[in-house]
Amino acid sequence: MALVAGSAAYQVLRGVTGTFPTQSATLLARAPALCARTLNRRRMSSRRQTDHLERTANTFRQEIISPAKVCEITNESATVKRVRLAIANREFTFKAGQWVDFFIPGVPKVGGFSICSCPGLLETEGVLELAVKYNLHPPAHWIHSQCTLGSEVAVRVGGEFCFDPQPSDLPLDLVLIAGGVGINPLFSILLHVADLHKTHEMTGRGFQMGNVKLYYCAKNTGELLFKRNILDLVKSFPGKITCSFHVTQQSSPVCVELQPFITEGRITEKDLASYVSTDQLCYICGPPPMIESTCKQLESLHVPKEQILFEKWW
């Protein structure tokens, strides 16, 4: 289950003014509209809370709560179900990287799940997707044990961790770093990046997206969510979208198709150093310890703190 706790201190909200470090001035001048919230790094190690609404009480939410109906359920992995929801309210929108409050009739607890589909899918088909890992928390347990085609729920968008460039913004390169089911919001961003590339290639208009690299770590290849979709994007946008998969407990042979993209072991500073530069924006999502170590690695590579955005899941 992917739940929001915050992002790093990168303040590029539309309409927000402030003083930024000189070393980031050039990037800030070219930065697109990003959603982010200042977060004291000490909160990274704060005690775990179990309630999504408590954790996100001070986080932005839209006013619209839309009815939704489950229209497709698939097994993304042995432990993760991918759920497609048909959204009833046509005014309902979201930005790549955001999440939803998930309301289930008869279940008192409200779920909080990152959206793994892109805004374009909602615009064209009226649906969004969630990928939910099994656990005993009531909303996640309901999805794995009781949710069926036609089940009715309600959703509300929230979150300040997103990528929403405007057509007039200058090109920008991204680094996406995911751990486990922390891939969800980053996959949404990656799909949105692909849509931006398609739009610019077909029309010559809109935001001109730079290059993106995804680093994604999971226990084994079976737990690498969306891996086929990700490889399809890499093939469709050679050089513009690249990826590096990392596995920490792989016990079976890796299939031939995945082998060129697989590295055994966690994502290290050396891995990041081969690609990361000081003029990129870095998005991180995963367990708090993974975020803490990755932030330190990026700072060691001289990436300004203002260019490191993160979101925790629990």
From Swiss-Prot:
Per the UniProt entry, the disulfide pairs are none
Q: Residue limits of the FAD-binding FR-type domain?
A: 63-166
User: Would I find Oxidoreductase among this entry's keywords?
Assistant: yes
Record flagged with keyword NAD: yes
Per its UniProt record, what Pfam families does this chain match?
NAD_binding_1 (PF00175)
For this protein, the Enzyme Commission number is 1.-.-.-
- Alphabetic keyword roster: NAD, Oxidoreductase, Signal
Q: Give the domain of life.
A: Eukaryota
Stored PROSITE patterns: FAD_FR
A GO term for molecular function: oxidoreductase activity
Q: EC class of this enzyme?
A: oxidoreductase
Note the InterPro entries from the entry. Answer: FAD-bd_FR_type, FNR_nucleotide-bd, Oxidoreductase_NAD-binding, OxRdtase_FAD/NAD-bd, Riboflavin_synthase-like_b-brl
N-terminal signal peptide: 1-18
Quick one: which residues bind NAD(+)?
Answer: G180, V181, G182, I183, N184, P185
Q: What is this protein called?
A: Oxidoreductase NAD-binding domain-containing protein 1
List the taxonomic lineage: Eukaryota, Metazoa, Chordata, Craniata, Vertebrata
